[in-house]
């Protein structure tokens, strides 16, 4: 496993931060199908989604509904850059006139996303998660941690933490 720490200025567009952009360039290939459930202005993934209809994305769904669109083991890679805090989740929903409920502001909101990502990724598929912690998808869902990138932004700004994980290949057939 690789652990790296590279300082960079913060940006509301996570994928434009240089060390993060460099990491993405190492993992994402044009021949693969990548999805992004929280694309905002990003065009890196093959199939994009953002709850906010003001962004030019392929879909404007709640992220959970977006992930549920895909068949089991059908996606090569997932970019998972959700709102980092429950307050940010609430702001995103309110910003597009959606009701903020107990369901959208509990930690189970993220767990449901992670369950769907685990289901749709192909064996050996990659999930790149962004946030303020390094939980990622996790070993308990059959993922292997390949890389952690810490991007400190200085002062009182929270670091951006990036985890890169691979869905373990399992062959359950005996013959």
Named regions from a protein language model:
Residues 1-49, 156-163, 172-175:
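S-adenosyl-L-methionine
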Residues 31, 121-127:
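Short glycine-dipeptide loop
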Residues 47-53, 62:
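Conserved acidic E/D residue at the C-terminus of a beta-strand in Rossmann-like folds
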Residues 64-80, 86:
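A short acidic, Gly/Pro-enriched loop at the edge of an enzyme's catalytic core
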Residues 82-83, 130-133:
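Short strand-turn motif at the edge of the Rossmann-like AdoMet-binding core
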Residues 86-88, 136:
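Short glycine-rich, flexible loops that bind phosphorylated cofactors or substrates
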Residues 94-123:
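A short glycine-rich, Lys/Arg-flanked "PGG" loop and its adjoining helix->strand segment in the class I
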Residues 135-175:
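Class I S-adenosyl-L-methionine
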């Amino acid at each position: 496993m690789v652990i790296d720490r590279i300082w960079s200025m913060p940006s509301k567009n996570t994928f434009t931060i240089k060390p993060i952009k460099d990491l993405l360039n190492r993992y994402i290939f044009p021949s693969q199908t990548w999805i992004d459930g929280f694309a905002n202005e990003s065009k890196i993934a093959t199939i994009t989604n953002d709850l906010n209809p003001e962004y030019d994305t392929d879909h404007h769904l709640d992220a959970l509904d977006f992930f549920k669109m895909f068949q089991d083991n059908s996606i090569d890679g997932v970019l998972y850059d959700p709102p980092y805090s429950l307050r940010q989740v609430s702001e995103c929903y309110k910003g597009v006139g959606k009701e903020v409920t107990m369901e959208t502001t509990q930690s189970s909101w993220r767990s449901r996303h992670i369950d769907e990502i685990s289901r749709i990724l192909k064996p050996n598929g990659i999930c790149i998660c962004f946030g303020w912690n390094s939980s990622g998808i996790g070993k308990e869902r059959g993922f292997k941690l390949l890389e952690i990138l810490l991007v400190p932004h200085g002062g009182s700004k929270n670091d951006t933490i990036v985890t890169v994980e691979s869905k373990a290949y399992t062959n359950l057939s005996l013959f």
